[in-house]
């Protein structure tokens, strides 16, 4: 029996994001790698909201908002930025009392994570809009990951990202959710302790987007050529654009530039994402596109630096602001790797769920019966 994800979405089980269960699975529906040295967008045709990524050697790792779905913070792996598989999850279950683990809380919990690698360890920071900024870490991205640490408590803190500076100081940038904090459209920075487990200074607003960049959010923190850079979207999820802030001082003042917008492309509101580079010296940018019921799809854009400003996508008129590409040459990572895509079906021939499946709350033994010998998963109605 081959069952599609839609069969299980009728109950508490959620099938997005999709994952790879077997090696080099290739979708019959959507393949980004065109097999001719080019790729097409989106590179991930599934709901990976607020993606972030980092490179460690020849390997790339990505995570995204999982909200209330568990296992949360699924970890994807790629060798070439185009072909991806799921290798694990950083938050296998929700913890009490930080969470309400046995009841679905749609849209809550894990918002806009940032994944980083520092001194041999992987870190993931995220904001829980009702609790504050959290962090987990691991030596191996496949796990095990530590239990979440509340780095900075505060209602409305979202979209957190750390930065380890050359002088040993650690900073965290974040935004605010207006629905909880009664403030939005600002970017703030605080300093963390050396272990990156606790904020040691109050947050300071370094950018106010109310005039030119309403709904600025999703900041990602980088440093290059002596400049501190904050990449962030503005203008709203389905209709916005990408802005970059830069300053020689971590607390500013920051100057800004719009570096990516829809333009004449069909890619509405290119939203928050991640800057990554390749071992060969190329620069690339991930972002998502909101397409309503289909979710938030991940796109990959070429990127270059001009006068210490990033230009993302294709800058057709030379004004420093690019527009998204739909097809482009694949990143040069020095090698060619096999085509693979996240899995989108399941034979259910085991006695546990494959890693592409998620629940809306901690698993309850009353919810499902696994009969791998019959290729069956039977779901039960359950009041919540």
Describe the residue ranges of each PLM region.
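Hydrophobic h-region of N-terminal signal peptides that target proteins for export
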Residues: 11-20
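Carbohydrate-active catalytic/glycan-binding domains of CAZyme proteins
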Residues: 21-384
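Bacterial N-terminal signal peptides that target proteins for export
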Residues: 1-10
């Amino acid at each position: 029996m081959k069952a599609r994800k839609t069969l299980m979405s009728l109950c508490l089980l959620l099938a997005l994001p999709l994952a790879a269960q077997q090696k080099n699975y290739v979708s019959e529906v959507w393949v980004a790698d065109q097999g001719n040295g080019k790729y097409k967008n989106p590179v991930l045709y599934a709901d990976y909201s607020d993606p972030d990524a980092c490179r460690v050697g020849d390997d790339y790792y990505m995570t995204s908002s999982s909200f209330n779905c568990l296992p949360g913070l699924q970890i994807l792996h790629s060798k070439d930025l185009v072909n991806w598989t799921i290798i694990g999850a950083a938050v296998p279950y929700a913890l009490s009392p930080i969470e309400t683990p046995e009841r679905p809380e749609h849209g809550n919990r894990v918002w806009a994570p940032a994944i980083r690698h520092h001194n041999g360890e992987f870190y993931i920071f995220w904001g829980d809009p009702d609790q504050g900024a959290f962090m987990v870490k691991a030596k191996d991205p496949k796990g095990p990951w530590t239990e979440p640490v509340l780095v900075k408590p505060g209602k409305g803190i979202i979209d957190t990202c750390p930065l380890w500076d050359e002088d040993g100081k650690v900073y965290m940038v974040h935004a605010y959710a207006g629905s909880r904090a009664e403030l939005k459209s600002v970017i703030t920075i605080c300093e963390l302790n050396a272990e990156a487990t606790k904020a040691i200074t109050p947050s300071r607003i370094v950018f106010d987007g109310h005039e030119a960049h309403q709904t600025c959010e999703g900041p990602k923190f980088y440093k290059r050529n002596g400049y501190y850079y904050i990449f962030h979207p503005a203008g709203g999820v389905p209709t916005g654009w990408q802005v970059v802030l830069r300053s020689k001082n971590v607390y500013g003042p920051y100057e800004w530039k719009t570096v990516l917008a829809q333009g004449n492309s069909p890619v509405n509101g290119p939203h928050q994402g991640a800057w990554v580079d390749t071992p060969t010296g190329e620069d690339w940018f991930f972002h998502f596109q909101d397409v309503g019921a289909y979710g938030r799809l991940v796109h990959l854009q070429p990127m270059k630096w001009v006068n210490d400003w990033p230009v993302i996508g294709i800058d057709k008129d030379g004004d420093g602001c690019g527009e998204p590409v739909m097809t482009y040459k694949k990143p040069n990572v020095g090698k060619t790797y096999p085509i693979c895509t996240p899995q989108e079906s399941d034979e259910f021939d085991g006695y546990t769920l494959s890693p592409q499946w998620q629940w809306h709350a901690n698993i309850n033994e009353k919810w499902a019966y696994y009969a791998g010998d019959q290729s069956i998963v039977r779901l039960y109605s359950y009041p919540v």
